[in-house]
Amino acid sequence: MTDKIRTVQGRVISDKMDKSFTIAIERKVKHPLLGKFIRRTTKLHVHDENNEARIGDTVEIKECRPVSKTKSWTLVRVVEKAVEA
């Protein structure tokens, strides 16, 4: 089986859940009529076994079997920590 595992990067927007967090993935889509590029956001719930991610972190996630009703992604690594103010 040579299926490639899907991985994406996004920014953590919520970490209030236990062993879970929510990320936002931004992409740019061209408007069909105006031709202008518009930002679109996708929110995903991610499984985080060790509660590593914090709000503002940039993380890499991969697709996995469904962990719950809304979670079918798991944390691979924290790419960049958020800047603490």
Curated annotation (Swiss-Prot):
Superkingdom, natural source: Bacteria
Functional note: One of the primary rRNA binding proteins, it binds specifically to the 5'-end of 16S ribosomal RNA.
Entry's family note: Belongs to the universal ribosomal protein uS17 family.
Single GO cellular component term: cytosolic small ribosomal subunit
Organism annotation: Mannheimia succiniciproducens (strain KCTC 0769BP / MBEL55E)
Gene3D superfamilies (UniProt xref): Nucleic acid-binding proteins
PANTHER family in the record: 40S RIBOSOMAL PROTEIN S11 FAMILY MEMBER, SMALL RIBOSOMAL SUBUNIT PROTEIN US17M
Protein name: Small ribosomal subunit protein uS17
Keywords: Ribonucleoprotein, Ribosomal protein, RNA-binding, rRNA-binding
